[in-house]
Amino acid sequence: MSSRVCPQRPVAKSSGDAKVLLIVSTYKPRAAVLAADVVNFLSIRGFQCHTIEYDGLNKESCARAGYMFAVSIGGDGTTLFAARCASPSGIPILAINLGRFGFIAPIEPRYWQQALSDYLAGGVRPAERALISCTVTRAGKEIASCLALNDVVLSSGRVARLTRAEVCFNDISFGVYEADGIILATPTGSTAYSAACGGPILDPDLDAFVLTPISALCLSNRPVVVPSSGVVRIKVLSMRHKETVLSVDGHELCTLQEEDQLLASRSSCSARLVFCTPHVFYHALCSKLAWSGSIFSRRGRRHDD
């Protein structure tokens, strides 16, 4: 399942050897002050805190095993970065939201002490979210690899230029896509760029990915939901402008050439996100995307008026 709940042991008070990783946004005005408060809160309880500053441009490196958990302080972008850093080592992530949406950063700043206390007491279990494992090959050699919690996007590097690519799933060709780009999104990422391009929103518990074309030239190229147990292969075809970009969770990974191939499948590791329950997910859909039903109910009028 994409959002499996993991067993949780009481963390309790540390003897001083336990380490906590803080990943702190440098472009959120309140982040530094809040981070200092979190460090003080944890230090009193015997934890050693190590901090990584995230400026939106960092290239992630895998956090070493040994951290009991990580605290992300920023928005969804900071949480995405934290997931790519912490997930290979199985480190749970508590994400405090200082951004606008907070789909995967569910802890509001005014509740951070209660959230940490509940987690340390063992009252909250992290849920596993699926990650995409992606490799890029050129002439049979791997030139890049990545993990993505939201999505991987193949797109033209220029405005108003089409990308041509053949899309296959488990070696079954879906045909050639001529579009502004192609998105492969996880259930977590289905609420982001894919949704903006007309893709469906997937429940986090679904073992599936969604392939969504961006402004496809052929109207029959529609979003397709595929099981995450398979392998998606995208081959870059000849194009006039000679420039196709691969982005991961909103950050450019590399520039692709003709005949380059992208292979994507579900990663063997998952993002362990604390407080990202199904209830929180659906509440976020209603509140963050302003789902409020009838326009009459929003105005406080009866449906039969």
Curated annotation (Swiss-Prot):
GO molecular function: ATP binding; metal ion binding; NAD binding; NAD+ kinase activity
Active site feature: 76
EC number, UniProt record: 2.7.1.23
Alphabetized UniProt keyword annotations: ATP-binding, Cytoplasm, Kinase, NAD, NADP, Nucleotide-binding, Transferase
GO biological process: NAD metabolic process; NADP biosynthetic process
Coiled-coil segments: none
InterPro entries, per database record: ATP-NAD_kinase_N, ATP-NAD_kinase_PpnK-typ_C, NAD/diacylglycerol_kinase_sf, NADK
Domain of life, per lineage: Bacteria
Reaction(s) the record says it catalyses: NAD(+) + ATP = ADP + NADP(+) + H(+)
GO CC list: cytoplasm
Compartment(s) where it occurs, according to its Swiss-Prot or TrEMBL record: Cytoplasm
Residues reported in the UniProt entry to bind NAD(+): 76-77, 150-151, 161, 180
Gene3D superfamilies membership: Probable inorganic polyphosphate/atp-NAD kinase, domain 1, Probable inorganic polyphosphate/atp-NAD kinase, domain 2
Known cofactor(s): a divalent metal cation
Record function comment: Involved in the regulation of the intracellular balance of NAD and NADP, and is a key enzyme in the biosynthesis of NADP. Catalyzes specifically the phosphorylation on 2'-hydroxyl of the adenosine moiety of NAD to yield NADP.
Family: Belongs to the NAD kinase family.
PANTHER family hit by this protein: NAD KINASE
Protein name: NAD kinase
Organism from which the protein derives: Treponema pallidum (strain Nichols)
Gene name of this polypeptide: nadK
